[in-house]
Amino acid sequence: MTGRAAAPEFLPIVLALTTRDKGRELLRRAFTRRRTKLLLVRTAEAAGATLRTTLVDAVVVDLCAGGDDAWAVAALARQLPSIPFFALVAPRLADAAVLGRSAALEVTDLLIEGVDDAALRELVVPQAFTARFAAALRGAHAPLGLEAPLQQRAWEYVVSAGGRPVRTDAIARALDVTREHLSRSFATSGAPNLKRVIDLVRLIAAAELAKNPGYDLADVATVLGFASPSHLANTAYRVAGIRTASLTRLRTRDLLTRFCQGRSRSRV
């Protein structure tokens, strides 16, 4: 077994609305298939449907052509504050009016076409939902008693998924160990079971998304890949002893505390 870090297999998902060929070409060059999953849509309806069914890491709205749909999608930034929204504008549009309207809609940043082209990915991806989620939880393994190198590497892999479903065999492959060795070694010295930890991280992501006005609990269950809202409810009770309605007010610290109070072990 090596000491290298796990290699996450989760590409950031960027949703982009544009009606221009030039806009699509620019976005495809910036967010290549090898490094990003780019979802291109042309209408506000399609963007809204995607946001309700997929855990999107960032949204880029092409304002260069204007139009009601573009501003309608930009307005979703206030409804989904966990997801960063970026406005792609031409230099001639980067005036006080556009800046003021974008700021009022709580758009994360402006991307200037022709100026920021080569740096679009570097400007967007570090602020993506999954990147910020993983960074916020990177040190949260300590209260769980995950101090061994293998435990920490597995933890980093799990949080890198941003709350998406994670299989133990995928973690084992990334860490270059067998699934049996991983499960056995992870839960040593009273540490929680790996499967339970995966559920905890998914519940923390659900709590983050549930605080967004634009999501109801059914939406949260869908975007995080739970089989149904009932599946999310069962996970919330099993992991933290709570009802899903409590997710809108509980912080990560609260969920970690409840998890450590006797709910960190599962049958395997």
Indicate where each model-derived feature is located:
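…primarily DNA-binding HTH/wHTH and HhH modules…
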Residues: 230, 234-268
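Short, Lys/Arg-enriched, Trp-marked, Pro/Gly-tolerant hinge/linker segments that flank
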Residues: 127-156, 164, 188-194
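Acidic, metal-coordinating helix/loop segments flanking the phosphotransfer/catalytic sites
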Residues: 42-58, 65-66
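Conserved acidic segment of CheY-like receiver
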Residues: 9-22, 27-31, 39-40, 47, ...
